[in-house]
Amino acid sequence: MKKINIAIDGPAGAGKSTISKLLAKKLGYIHIDTGAMYRAIGLKVLNSNIKSNEVEKILEVLDNTDIQIKIVAGSQLVLLDGEDVTEKIRQPSVSMYASDVSKIKEVREKLVKIQQDLAKQKGVIMDGRDIGTYVLPDAELKIFLTATAEERAKRRFLELKEKGYEVDYYQLLDEIKQRDLNDMTRELAPLRVAEDAIVIDSTNLTIEEVLQKVLELFYKVIGNEV
């Protein structure tokens, strides 16, 4: 079976990473969570006590930052200056920093180069905000996965509670709405639906139902049936 690249875009909390991981396991593909890269930069900025609007200081940090993606036993590890930060970058405090640094041109350029290099061999499922429109515009299958802000906040709330974080639903909802605004209005590669993307609204769908829809689209692209 020939291998293709799959781009899965959408707003924060839409379930992109969850679906991408399941799809990668099902197809034997590599999953690249590009948002994790921006979170890694956000984590370093946060730990450096730099405000997210101090662009010059962020660029200084960027020049001395090494980000690597490793695939181990089918799972993605994010290495920040040699340290595995895969779990640390999921802290709630990192989210807004990731959104803010993603608006900086030099940050996006550095990370997009890494992302494009990872996809050269095909067989990659890449999820993010600008994969189908900017990072992998030639991806053979493009999905735009979305859900209402309220549903996305609820999912994030339950996920964080399960991990032991004390979080407030309404604060999460406000943060998600702010991230949506940031992502859609940034100057470089804003969040938008690619012209050739298929939109899936997961608000009232189970994970299994979304996965089935994506699998049907995948097999249609490569000329087979589920």
UniProtKB/Swiss-Prot annotation:
Catalytic activity: CMP + ATP = CDP + ADP; dCMP + ATP = dCDP + ADP
Molecular-function GO terms, alphabetical: ATP binding; CMP kinase activity; dCMP kinase activity
Pfam families, per the entry: Cytidylate_kin (PF02224)
Keyword DNA repair assigned: no
Subcellular location(s) per record: Cytoplasm
CDD domains: CMPK
Binding site for ATP: G10, P11, A12, G13, A14, G15, K16, S17, T18
GO biological process, one term: nucleobase-containing small molecule interconversion
Keywords: ATP-binding, Cytoplasm, Kinase, Nucleotide-binding, Transferase
InterPro entries: Cytidylate_kin, Cytidylate_kinase_dom, P-loop_NTPase
PANTHER family per record: CYTIDYLATE KINASE, CYTIDYLATE KINASE/PANTOATE-BETA-ALANINE LIGASE
Family: Belongs to the cytidylate kinase family. Type 1 subfamily.
Protein name per the record: Cytidylate kinase
Gene name, Swiss-Prot/TrEMBL: cmk
